[in-house]
Amino acid sequence: MARGHRSQIKRERNANKDTRPSAKSSYARVSVQKACFVLDAIRGKDVQTALGIVTYNPRYASTLIKKLLESAIANAENNNQMNVENLYVAECYANKGPTMKRVKPRAQGRAYRIEKRMSHITVVLDER
């Protein structure tokens, strides 16, 4: 059990928080595997290069990740007063979300289950 006053506990928790600019998309309608193809391409790159990669990537996940990356850049500029030229993609990952289960009718009265997977995508930036 935690000791101390509630405000003291909150103060300590906030002191340990990660202050790097980030953006998160929850319940994105793309599977983790498909999102990771794009995320692997931009990990470790500077933000201008990463934006170029996701802009010209034909995958559907790249449109979601481009929006997320632009949001993280705006957070870095407005909330953390960081310079855009020095930013790079420090972390980017996709975690598994819930799965929507659907039924597809098949031949001779059978039914197949269709699983529409979701993911939670996170992009974290940092300065070099």
Describe each model-derived feature in a short phrase.
Residues 2-94, 118-128:
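Ribosome large-subunit tunnel/peptidyl-transferase-proximal elements
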Residues 97-128:
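Strongly charged
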